[in-house]
A protein has these predicted regions:
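Extracytoplasmic small-molecule ligand-binding "clamshell" domains
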Residues: 32-109, 118
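Ligand-binding clefts/hinges and TM-proximal coupling segments of bilobed small-molecule sensing domains
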Residues: 33-34, 163-177, 219, 248-278
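Flexible hinge/capping segments at coil-to-helix
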Residues: 37, 136-154
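Short loop->beta-strand "edge-of-pocket" segments that line small-molecule binding or catalytic clefts
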Residues: 44-52, 146-161, 176
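Hydrophobic/proline-rich hinge and linker segments of small-molecule sensing/allosteric domains
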Residues: 48-51, 122-144, 231-234
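Short helix-initiation/N-cap motifs at beta->coil->alpha
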Residues: 70, 86-96, 141, 178-192, ...
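A ligand-binding cleft/hinge motif common to bilobed small-molecule-binding domains
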Residues: 93, 109-118, 167-170, 191-192, ...
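Periplasmic-binding protein-like
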Residues: 128-132, 202, 206-248, 267-278
């Protein structure tokens, strides 16, 4: 029988070699599956996951995508020498689609939240908006306080999978929250008199209350919440985050992001461009 030390040494070397071989076989597969910054540069195209909601991203009368997020993604790609490919995705499935590598980054007005940060890596914020409520003049007549909407017979509409659903549930825990695939459907539910109010990212409630002043009003002068929007990439993609952070810093410093935000969020100069039903 061989000494214990000799047997242990041989076993350890064999085990080590086996482990290193397995690691060597695994690493290339992991690297090739990760569309990191170098892969985007080689491809020459940035694939952007987004969802349509006014004025972040929407269709014009020719069917082309326009909006704040579209401007941001196009400028990012142009500054980087890339093409841009937009991947329209249902909002409630946009994070799973990112994790499934359907695209490289989410640029879609996504608010930074602790819960989302468990699944994705956020960049520095590139815009700062918030959430507001528009109410039905018919069903919510005389409502002016938060507690007026926090009742069991009150129905509040919101876009499925959006941060607004969380705001609705936390602010009005007694009310029923009705979820729809997009903001347009949620607002239409209130306009039709089937819900007391709709919660959406500003300035959608403000704009819709002006457009439909006969049926909608803003009961609160202050927004329900203020938030930060950021790009989202997959956890561990620090190279992409650093690159995007620098771009955001540059476009913030030269005033471009603020100028585009003010155009899309503080004016209605673009309104005659968009297709109906959005």
């Amino acid at each position: 029988m061989k000494p214990f030390g000799q047997r242990l040494g041989r076993f350890s070397v064999k085990t080590l070699l086996t482990g290193l071989l397995g690691l060597a076989l695994t690493l290339p597969a992991v690297a090739s599956d990760t569309p990191d910054l170098d892969t985007i540069k080689e491809r020459g195209t940035l694939r952007v996951g987004m969802s349509t909601f006014v004025p972040w991203a929407m269709r014009d009368k020719q069917g082309e995508l326009i909006g704040f997020e579209i401007d941001v993604a196009k400028r990012l790609a142009a500054d980087s020498g890339w093409q841009v490919e937009f991947v329209p995705t249902a909002w409630d499935g946009i994070i799973p689609a990112l994790l499934a590598k359907k695209f490289d980054v989410i640029i879609g007005g996504m608010s930074v939240t602790p819960e989302r940060s468990k699944s994705v890596l956020f960049t520095a914020p590139y815009s700062h908006s918030g959430v507001q409520l528009a109410a039905s003049k018919k069903l919510a007549e005389g409502f002016s306080k938060l507690e007026d909407f926090n009742k069991r017979n009150v129905k509040i509409a919101a876009r499925r999978g959006a941060f607004t659903v969380q705001v609705a549930r936390e602010t009005f825990p007694k009310a029923s929250v009705l979820q729809f695939d997009d903001d347009a459907q949620a607002f239409q539910e209130v306009i039709n008199g089937n819900a007391h109010a709709v919660i959406a990212s500003s300035p959608k409630p403000e704009h819709e209350s002006i457009k439909h002043s006969d049926s909608l009003f803003l009961p609160f002068s202050e927004r329900l919440s203020k938030g930060n929007e950021a790009f989202a990439v997959r956890l561990g993609e620090e190279d992409k985050k650093a690159y995007f952070d620098q771009w955001i810093a540059d476009r913030t410093a030269d005033g471009w992001l603020q100028a585009r935000y003010e155009y899309w969020f503080s004016t209605l100069d673009w309104q005659d461009q968009i297709a109906s039903g959005q």
